[in-house]
Amino acid sequence: MQEQYRPEEIESNVQQHWDEKQTFKVTEDEGKEKYYCLSMLPYPSGRLHMGHVRNYTIGDVISRYQRMLGKNVLQPIGWDAFGLPAEGAAVKNNTAPAPWTYANIDYMKNQLKLLGFGYDWNRELATCQPEYYRWEQWFFTKLYEKGLVYKKTSAVNWCPHDMTVLANEQVIDGCCWRCDSKVERKEIPQWFVKITDYADELLNDLDKLESWPEQVKTMQRNWIGRSEGVEIEFTVLNSEEKLSVYTTRPDTFMGVTYLAVAAGHPLAAQAALNNPALADFIAECRNTKVAEADMATMEKKGMATGLFAAHPLTGEKVPVWVANFVLMEYGTGAVMAVPGHDQRDWEFASKYSLPIKPVILAADGSEPDLSGSAMTEKGTLFNSGEFDGLSHEAGFDAIAAKLADKGVGERKVNYRLRDWGVSRQRYWGAPIPMVTLEDGTVMPTPEDQLPVILPEDVVMDGITSPIKADAEWAKTTVNGQPALRETDTFDTFMESSWYYARYTCPNYDKGMLDPAAANYWLPVDQYVGGIEHAIMHLLYFRFFHKLLRDTGLVNSDEPAKRLLCQGMVLADAFYFTGSNGERNWVSPTDVSVERDEKGRITKATDNDGNELIYAGMSKMSKSKNNGIDPQVMVERYGADTVRLFMMFASPAEMTLEWQESGVEGANRFLKRVWRLAFEHTEKGPTVALDLDALNDEQKALRRDLHKTISKVSDDIGRRQTFNTAIAAIMELMNKLARAPQETEQDRALMQEALLAVVRMLNPFTPHASFVLWQALGGAGEIDNAPWPQAEEAAMVEDSLLVVVQVNGKVRGKITVAADATQEQVQARAAQEHLVAKYLDGVTIRKVIFVPGKLLNLVVG
């Protein structure tokens, strides 16, 4: 082997070897235990960022470790290739989304290869390819036939800039998450998939996901939002109209003082016909902040409709208001207001001088003070007629029963979850496979006409989707009749909801999935991705798997057994304020800093001499110009160093602070490993290790070796604390570097240790490990080598440190044989100077002995 560690040479050679040998290509093998490790597929934006590198390094470490355990490991990669950014980039660069996307895929694929990830590239897929999305279209038609797909006109969040629909989660502070334009409300026809039909199963099966983060499961439980309550019908006075509301607190029903409906409610529209002020208010509401998260903090506004409803149990007149905090998409689009016992209702009633009626006693049995806020705690009913004196539970049941008896209420289970709107009014997505015949009949595209191919040779004007602008594209013939194709495309979450299954059979052309391959590999054993996907992708991912199961394509209930959500990558952020008052962010690579004795930045300047303000560590982003290009780091230090730093600098699920000094430290460590291996191999072959001939020092070193193997195995396999695994290897390396190399057994032990170290490092630093394994004479290639096994016998201590106490106070520590008896330990303690002086002239009245740990002498 060469004396110097030169990653730029060895990494390209090793990568070429993997390519030529197709080292990571796998097929189904019933004779081997399978392991499917998957990182969330990237969007081909053009360049990898450090967040990608962290995600994929974690997945690769796990995959390589499991491979060394002898498993048949599938680790695929592909491209989530549809999506809005491609359209913007195409307009900006005067091209079409397809060539821009394919060029990015080629570039990023090369970047992934430079990082040495062990992917089965034969399974690579891009979701924008017709051979992929044809099966998504086919599946959609099957869901339609099963009654799980429908079309309805619905109020949506509309981004006027991007001209597309946004999910509620994509509306941040009333603005589009992508372009920051103010979001509007708009009624348009949309296709929906009935995820609500699976709400109970999606909720209950979270309990099966024992190896998913609790935080993700809690977020999904809250998003599904199951509640038990009563749906109640009010009659609008002087009309035949009925108004339905849902409440989880029927025990407070006698405290209703007003009803509130959404701006989009039919009753609101009816009331506005002869009320211009109300019509204006409704228009204002339609363009107000619309994300559900905004509801809690935005100003509550309302206007009386002039309509009244009759309280179903008392007959009292209850005014009907339009309120901006009621959403048409949630529940019935109307709510009953109990301002005495709901804070939002209290704030609204206080603002508009509406009655506030208490109907629940305070905990001490007194009437609650509602002058400053509502009393939201549950308690005993009062001011509620025949229901006075009932507890919360009894009141709930009694009022629900009374409403049911009168035919104006029924118990219901409600969900916060809404059906999945999958229509997007953009071009760069999979066409929705539905057609409309001349007579108005809507039907799925026949199977023999699939895929409905998205034309790729288009001109983008940045405003209208090319397939909407091209009237000819929509024209087709179905069953001999002229028909028009749907010109909306699928939400890109459709593609990313089933890609994991298609990886098991990416070239299968007889169906969506090859059942034999899918059921061999699925479910995914380890999924890796960011927690920001908890309530969108990860919920759709689980939903789609259940749809696949119920179509007979897979035989498991959940798509992934274990989930690891990696933390964000942070970097220093610097800026100076320009003459226009705006912040100009400067890349950390263009900044010179001065630090104090504690390493804190005290001064920063850029290459132009501008004095900079240090904004602290923040997520790497284009907006703060603090992204670090992985390719630059790989060229400077090598892929193994970047990978090692990524896994060492922080626990996988925590944020990682990018520090180039830490990268340099990882590089120095690899050089030390290389140097020790070089010095060892230069001395020639070693003899076999003779365990019986080892002296105490050699036994101690071997004990440390096998304890390290045990710890690293547990840290990677069970605990997934990769940083502590690397720390343990580093600690062992320090001991090996100091170990004597005078005798043949010294060198034989070093040979065993280095072969183990190289294998333990292999998941993290596969290129260097590949070369070092060969240089050390390891059998075969390291990619097929078994993980080192910790020998129990080697880890047994010859001697132990025992704490000696006199009357419960520590007086000394002694080293004794591991199998020493109480008498032997006591005799050895009596010889210890620090202990002996406390035993002079006293009587030992009691001895407390914990073998291998403690001797406590009680004297008097």
Swiss-Prot record:
User: What domain of life does the native source organism fall in?
Assistant: Bacteria
Q: What is this protein called?
A: Leucine--tRNA ligase
Read off the Pfam families from this record. Anticodon_1, tRNA-synt_1, tRNA-synt_1_2, tRNA-synt_1g
Task: Establish whether keyword Protein biosynthesis is in the entry.
Answer: yes
Which gene produces this protein?
A: leuS
The keyword ATP-binding is assigned to this record = yes
Which one of the record's GO molecular function terms can you name?
Answer: leucine-tRNA ligase activity
- Which intervals of this chain are the motif 'HIGH' region? 42-52
One GO biological process from the UniProt record?
leucyl-tRNA aminoacylation
Motif 'KMSKS' region per UniProt: ranges: 619-623
